[in-house]
């Protein structure tokens, strides 16, 4: 039997919003498998949805810039929100974005080795900034996109860089449309461009969960299939950009809005500061005791 810890129960509660005892039972029933426990709670109708993404817990900012042919979106992390709002930090982020746009390195490792206009490597430039600012700073990730002539980049930065989105549309040069789509992505956070992009494995998994959910609700077997079909269609439309109601005009979908310009969304990148990074949580008792001992 798997050892179910309080931390595992806490994590499952955060991901599903289910009660403590329900989470503990789910973990026991699934031998401590977190993903299976999420499915178990969903099938029982206890968890409304699986929040499988890691907690957002780091500071820093994203940035998006472009030129005639290329665009870059990147994330730079710092330890505190205070530093993230510092002018020196924001200038560093802008300088790193311009460097990556100019050099277009293939990887993060390559980016850190490139030489900036002042002769420093990117890594040395960051190290120097750490000394001046007094916090650990890191270039976490970036993506570079290239466009053809009859295309448009859309750039959108939300909440002073908390979220950065870069879109690429083909078949139109309308940057307003491209930016509107980027704004929508920042707000709604779709997983895919279209439902055709969803893997068969994900569809099969969701169908299995929805089927078990319907059966557990006591629905007759002869109508379960139709229920699952309807719920699956709704699920796919919710995670697919083109099928989502457009935030600026919910009467049409994003796909319909883009089609009016003669274009098509071919790619998008959405970075949210700290997603997938879990900040260290100090034990409250230990924190108090550490202060007492000083």
UniProtKB/Swiss-Prot annotation:
One of its GO terms (cellular component) is cytoplasm. GO terms for biological process: translational elongation. Belongs to the EF-Ts family. It is found in: Cytoplasm. InterPro entries: EF-Ts_dimer_sf, Transl_elong_EFTs/EF1B, Transl_elong_EFTs/EF1B_dimer, Transl_elong_Ts_CS, UBA-like_sf. Residues 80-83 are annotated as: Involved in Mg(2+) ion dislocation from EF-Tu. Its main location: cytoplasm. Associates with the EF-Tu.GDP complex and induces the exchange of GDP to GTP. It remains bound to the aminoacyl-tRNA.EF-Tu.GTP complex up to the GTP hydrolysis stage on the ribosome. Keywords: Cytoplasm, Elongation factor, Protein biosynthesis. This is Elongation factor Ts. The gene is tsf. It holds the Pfam family EF_TS. The keyword Calcium does not apply. It comes from Listeria monocytogenes serovar 1/2a (strain ATCC BAA-679 / EGD-e). One of its GO terms (molecular function) is translation elongation factor activity.
């Amino acid at each position: 039997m798997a050892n179910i810890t309080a931390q595992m129960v806490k994590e499952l509660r955060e991901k599903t919003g289910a009660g403590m005892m329900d989470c503990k039972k789910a973990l026991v029933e699934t031998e401590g498998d977190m993903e299976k426990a999420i499915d178990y709670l969903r099938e029982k109708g206890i968890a409304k949805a699986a929040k499988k993404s890691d907690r957002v817990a780091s500071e820093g900012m994203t940035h998006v810039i472009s030129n005639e042919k290329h665009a870059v979106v990147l994330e730079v992390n710092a330890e505190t929100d205070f530093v993230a709002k510092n002018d020196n930090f924001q200038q560093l982020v802008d300088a790193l974005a311009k460097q990556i746009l100019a050099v277009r390195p293939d990887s993060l490792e390559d980016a850190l080795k490139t030489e900036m206009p002042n002769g420093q490597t990117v890594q040395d430039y960051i190290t120097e900034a750490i000394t001046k600012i007094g916090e650990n700073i890191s270039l976490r990730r970036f993506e570079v996109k290239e466009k053809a002539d009859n295309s448009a980049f859309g750039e959108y930065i939300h909440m002073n860089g908390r979220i950065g989105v870069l879109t690429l549309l083909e078949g139109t040069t309308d940057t307003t449309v491209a930016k509107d789509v980027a704004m929508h992505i920042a707000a709604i956070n779709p997983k895919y461009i279209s439902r055709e992009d969803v893997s068969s494995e994900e569809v099969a998994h969701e169908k299995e969960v929805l089927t078990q959910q319907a059966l557990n609700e006591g629905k007759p077997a002869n109508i379960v299939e139709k229920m699952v079909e309807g719920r699956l269609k709704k699920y796919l439309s919710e995670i697919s950009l083109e099928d989502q109601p457009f935030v600026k005009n919910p009467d049409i979908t994003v796909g319909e809005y883009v089609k009016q310009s003669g274009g098509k969304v071919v790619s998008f990148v959405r970075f949210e500061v700290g997603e997938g990074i879990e900040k260290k949580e100090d034990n409250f008792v230990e924190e108090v005791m550490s202060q007492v001992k000083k």
